Amino acid sequence: MTLIYLLLALFAERMLSKPDHCHSNFYIDKYIDWLNKKSYLTQSVSTSGLSLMWLLPGLLLVAALTIVNVSIIDFAVTLFVLYMAIGCPELRNTYKCYLQAANQGDIDTCNIYTQQLGLGQLEPRTFGQHLIWLNYQRYAAPMIMFVVFGLFGVVAYGCLRTLHGYSQANNIHVQSSLSKVLHVLDWLPIRITAFGFLLVGHFSNALPKWVGFLFDTSTHAKLVLA
């Protein structure tokens, strides 16, 4: 059933236009706005409090589905959450605009789109690595989280990633604890994703490097994909 969910979600993500209310960030951003209005997200927030914030939405959703216990509702909600979590049309459209600017040789416009994709300035090698990282976050990570932790994992990972970005942007002092949790959660998915790239790339050349990272717990997840 897990495979069916993933295939249906990927098919829907590719075939259907995804409006704002069908993207996970739409709801997570509203959740963060609510936390701000209630003054829960402040500089004095504790590590345990911040942990509860990214765990709570997933726990509540799973609890609600368990209480309702109707198969068709469980199926529809699970599929919709996966559909929202997988992919990012805004990033895809930005990348298409970047390619158009690159084909026209417009370096200044390329730099603008590069910044929108999360990089400071255009560097071909770094840019390619960053695109791989974005695809991991939007596709591989939520799919693997769903396989390992179910619907709770998809929601919790999305909340954790967004709260981590928010805490970095606002210099919340416990952001380091979120970084450590993300590092642990990304450890297995990033190596599975890297192995997938091995199978479609230079397997014999890259395999020794992949094996070297296999039990490495210190290297940042983004560098493993590089």
Residue ranges and their predicted role:
Residues 1-226:
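Hydrophobic N-terminal alpha-helices or hydrophobic patches in metabolic proteins across all domains
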